């Protein structure tokens, strides 16, 4: 997969290029990243990429000309039909389903805004989709872009050493992940790993993990549960959990 990054701070993407799973994917030629700095496409000696907002108001707005030139260059590099995604708090919320959808593209151009945002006419002329990583505001689109890239890259076949790592991730099946434990089996304070995980019975371990995924999602993200078509067995697990929870409260 090819990524084109429109950013005035391309150095920030060393975090993607140089570390972890994403760096390995780049080294293995499964991913390529090209950065296009709008400052390189300006026409004035100060390399100005922003200006005051028409109508007044605090903050500066990123200019149309350098951004459009950077996007055009990115399209020439990645392909004229490459989808342009603007990282914006006004966009649709990014989630696992959206990641899977974006993964269908061979290439993506990620536009990272700064200041008060970008000239609206640029969005009208070039942006195919606006995406938000949450209902909060950051200083720029670089961190959201890296978040989106990391999420997509780990879904690319063979990027992760064990394909089960992807399947067992939170949200892969619409549920949160189950609890994980490592050595020692018992901590000095007596806190021990659930016995089923030490049993070697893979069928029982799988049942325990499924139960934990359902309960954890129900407790922490009921909105996710409501969107799923649960099996009769899954529904029974949750019904039993609710009954046990009520009984436990009654005994306190």
UniProtKB/Swiss-Prot annotation:
GO terms for biological process: tRNA N1-guanine methylation. It is found in: Cytoplasm. Coiled coil: none annotated. It catalyses: guanosine(37) in tRNA + S-adenosyl-L-methionine = N(1)-methylguanosine(37) in tRNA + S-adenosyl-L-homocysteine + H(+). Keywords: Cytoplasm, Methyltransferase, S-adenosyl-L-methionine, Transferase, tRNA processing. Its EC number is 2.1.1.228. InterPro entries: Alpha/beta_knot_MTases, tRNA_m1G_MeTrfase_C_sf, tRNA_m1G_MeTrfase_TrmD, tRNA_m1G_MTases_N, tRNA_MeTrfase_TRMD/TRM10. Pfam families: tRNA_m1G_MT (PF01746). Gene3D superfamilies: 3.40.1280.10, tRNA(m1g37)methyltransferase, domain 2. It is an enzyme of class 2 (transferase). CDD domains: TrmD-like. One of its GO terms (molecular function) is tRNA (guanine(37)-N1)-methyltransferase activity. Homodimer. Belongs to the RNA methyltransferase TrmD family. Specifically methylates guanosine-37 in various tRNAs. This is tRNA (guanine-N(1)-)-methyltransferase. It comes from Francisella tularensis subsp. novicida (strain U112). The gene is trmD.
């Amino acid at each position: 997969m090819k990524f084109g990054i429109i950013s005035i701070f391309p150095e920030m993407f060393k975090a993607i290029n140089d570390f972890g799973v994403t760096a390995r994917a780049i080294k293995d030629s499964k991913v390529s990243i090209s950065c296009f700095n709008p400052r390189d496409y300006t026409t004035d000696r100060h390399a100005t990429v922003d200006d005051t907002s028409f109508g007044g108001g605090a903050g500066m707005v990123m200019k149309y000309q350098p951004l459009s030139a950077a996007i055009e260059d990115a399209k020439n590099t990645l392909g004229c039909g490459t989808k342009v995604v603007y990282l914006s708090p006004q966009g649709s919320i990014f989630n696992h389903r959206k990641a899977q959808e974006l993964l269908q593209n061979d290439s993506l151009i990620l536009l990272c805004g700064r200041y008060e945002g970008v000239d609206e006419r640029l969005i009208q002329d070039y942006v195919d989709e606006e995406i938000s990583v949450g209902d909060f505001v950051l200083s720029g689109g670089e961190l959201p872009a890296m978040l989106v890239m990391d999420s997509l890259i780990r879904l690319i076949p063979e990027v992760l050493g064990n394909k089960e790592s992807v399947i067992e991730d939170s949200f892969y099946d619409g549920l949160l992940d189950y609890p994980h434990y490592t050595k020692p089996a018992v901590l000095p304070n007596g806190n021990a790993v659930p016995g089923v995980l030490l049993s070697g019975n893979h069928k029982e371990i799988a049942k325990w993990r499924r139960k934990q995924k359902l309960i954890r999602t129900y407790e922490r993200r009921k909105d996710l549960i409501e969107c799923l078509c649960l099996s009769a067995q899954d529904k029974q697990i949750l019904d039993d959990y609710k009954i046990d929870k009520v009984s436990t409260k009654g005994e306190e």
